[in-house]
Amino acid sequence: MAVSLSWYGVSTFRLEVDDTVVFLDAYLDRVPGAPPVGLTAAQVQRADYLLVGHAHFDHLADAGTIAGNTGATLIANFESIRLAAEAGVPEDRLMPVSGGEPIALADDLRVRVFPGLHSCVWSGGMRAADEAALGDDAVTHQQRRARMGGGGTLPPGLHSTRGDGGALGYLLENRHGSI
């Protein structure tokens, strides 16, 4: 069994297990001024699946390009799927999930989907590297919405007021182990 894992910054990884290529999130083409990651979405030659954590730009932005160029299937929450469909990804390449679904990716590779919680970077500071962050950042839903409404320095359209559709986590498994 051959396995390789490459990191492309933020939360984007390329996982290859034997002949199956899986992208975990799809954010390769950076906003202006950000350093490049060594690969653009247009340069991706092969992908079988895209597993997207939620519908924020830094997870989903290049899913349409990668799916369009490679024929990859996008597995994501319903908001991510809606945005991908609006961007022109064909329905037969879209697999909406919400958590609990086991999905066969290859003969000896499957993924289990889990619902998750997304942290809020507008919560008033980052925790120390050795401090656990378990999701309770003492910020109310109303405070979070108000802080996100400001938009900060993000270009228009990169953050939706509709939210992220709910965060998802993925566990990939085969007979040798899991990641």
Where are these regions (language model features)?
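Short acidic-hydrophobic, aromatic-tinged amphipathic segments that line or gate anion-handling sites
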Residues: 93-98, 104
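Beta-strand-turn-beta hairpins that frame and shape the catalytic cleft
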Residues: 1-5, 16-22, 102-112, 173-179
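Alpha-helix capping/helix-boundary segments
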Residues: 57, 80-81
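Short beta-strand scaffold segments in enzyme catalytic cores
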Residues: 12-15, 168-172
